[in-house]
Amino acid sequence: MNFAAEGYNSFETKKTPSGVIKYLPDPKAVIGLIQSGKLKEHILLVQGGTTTFLAPALSMGAIGVITMSGAPESHLGILAREFQMPCVMTAYLTNSDTRYVTGGNNDAHFAAIIDALEGKKAQLHCEDRETGRVAILG
């Protein structure tokens, strides 16, 4: 299987959710997705592991999350484990050398990930203890 991105795995699971990746930059986007009734059709892409505004989506049945920063010990990593929801954290593109740098300017890194993943049908693979992976389908 060809993996477009990988990162830290928030917890080991055999669940392999698939859906269209949707970037959620702010609380308004989260509420809009919930109100659309299409939450369970999407894997959620967010900037950080401290993205607390994503909590309503988790409790309403989100199927999976990809973060561009943050660690399994972050707020979102803990919530993902609590909700038993696959979550790939601090994702990076496997065909790129760019990586998230703590305290650095990561705008280009974030933009590249959003551009490469948003709107793509994907499947999360979190069966490895340490590494979560994102496969693009079709």
Predicted regions and their residues:
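Non-catalytic, soluble scaffold/interaction modules
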Residues: M1-S69, E73-S74, I78-G138
